[in-house]
C-alpha cells in the first residue's frame, strides 16, 4: 500500500445516509470536487471503503 493517498469527492452526499456524510466530513471532504491527501493507514482505508462509491482514490 502507498504511504499516502489522494481522495476526491465526485458524488454528492445529498440523499445519502447520515453515516456516509459523517465519514466524508471526517475525511475532510466537505464540498464536491474537493481533494485531500491522507496517510494510508488502516483507519483511513476503512473509512474510504465505506464511501468508495462517492470518491476517486489515487495512490501517491
From Swiss-Prot:
Which Gene Ontology molecular function entries are recorded, alphabetically? structural constituent of ribosome
For this protein, the record's CDD domains field holds: Ribosomal_L30
The protein's matches in InterPro entries, at most eight in alphabetical order, are given as: Ribo_uL30_ferredoxin-like_sf, Ribosomal_uL30_bac-type, Ribosomal_uL30_ferredoxin-like
Reply yes or no: does the keyword Ribosomal protein apply.
yes
GO biological process: one example = translation
Which Pfam families does UniProt cross-reference here? Ribosomal_L30
List the record's Gene Ontology CC terms alphabetically: cytosolic large ribosomal subunit
**Keywords on this record?**
Ribonucleoprotein, Ribosomal protein
Oligomer status and interactors: Part of the 50S ribosomal subunit.
Tell me which HAMAP family the record gives. Answer: Ribosomal_uL30_B
The record's family statement is:
Belongs to the universal ribosomal protein uL30 family.
Q: What is the protein name given in its UniProt record?
A: Large ribosomal subunit protein uL30
Amino acid at each position: 500500500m502507498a504511504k499516502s493517498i489522494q481522495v476526491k469527492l465526485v458524488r454528492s452526499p445529498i440523499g445519502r445516509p447520515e453515516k456516509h456524510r459523517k465519514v466524508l466530513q471526517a475525511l475532510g471532504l466537505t464540498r464536491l470536487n474537493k481533494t485531500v491527501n491522507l496517510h494510508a493507514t488502516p483507519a483511513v482505508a476503512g473509512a474510504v471503503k465505506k464511501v468508495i462509491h462517492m470518491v476517486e482514490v489515487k495512490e501517491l
